[in-house]
Amino acid sequence: MKQYKELCRHVLQHGDEKGDRTGTGTISTFGYQMRFDLQEGFPLLTTKKLHLKSIIHELLWFLKGDTNVKYLQENGVRIWNEWADENGELGRVYGAQWRSWASGDGETVDQITKLIHDIEHNPNSRRLIVSAWNPGEIDQMALPPCHCLFQFYVSNGKLSCQLYQRSADIFLGVPFNIASYALLTMMIAKVTNLEPGEFVHTLGDAHIYQNHLPQVNMQLEREERALPQLRITRDVKSIFDFTFDDFVLENYDPHPHIKGEVSV
């Protein structure tokens, strides 16, 4: 995807060397935006092969409101293992905030259910927002949310999504996040009888870890290939009824996978 390559080049050309929480070191810039027209194909990176199975299962896990890695591990997904405690718990991470945000009166808010309701009944609303950044519960999270707030927008029968990502690991995280929120947009469009529009990805601290520089440069040398298509195979009515088997990826022809170490 040219948008991703342009991001990589921008950070390499204009970024500053910075230290970070993990001690690895980064090249970083602040404030960057990419746009993806979901009618032009599913934005799954082609300059390296991505594990779509992990992307789908993680998103379904978020939507369940789950915060234990058991479901992920049962489905061969290990991306959260480094942060889980001995019981597999991660605390009040994404799923908890999306589905049971703790309000000040002792009640909880199911932000996803409210979002779907508002898209269906008040599509012109400028409040179609879900936040995972809950300052009162940051200390209860194994990892504070990197992709922390997203907003939907309905126009001309199309549903678009903008994500704000406070911390963006360009080699490992960002390709995953692009695909995940594009998929979420498609799923919500399906259950609200809309067409997918754009996915807009806004990055705060956009960084390349020092130990990922060879991998990023390898991707920049690879030619982009045509985007695949992702098809939803069933007429799903509720966002919570999707299963892994409801998605089929077609015409995905990526370059080989490139390994990179996760900075914890």
Swiss-Prot record:
EC number: 2.1.1.45
Pathway: Pyrimidine metabolism; dTTP biosynthesis
Keywords for this protein: Cytoplasm, Methyltransferase, Nucleotide biosynthesis, Transferase
Source organism superkingdom: Bacteria
Catalytic EC class: transferase
Function: Catalyzes the reductive methylation of 2'-deoxyuridine-5'-monophosphate (dUMP) to 2'-deoxythymidine-5'-monophosphate (dTMP) while utilizing 5,10-methylenetetrahydrofolate (mTHF) as the methyl donor and reductant in the reaction, yielding dihydrofolate (DHF) as a by-product. This enzymatic reaction provides an intracellular de novo source of dTMP, an essential precursor for DNA biosynthesis.
NCBIfam families from the UniProt entry: PRK01827.1-3, PRK01827.1-5, thym_sym
Family as reported in the entry's similarity comment: Belongs to the thymidylate synthase family. Bacterial-type ThyA subfamily.
Official protein name in the record: Thymidylate synthase
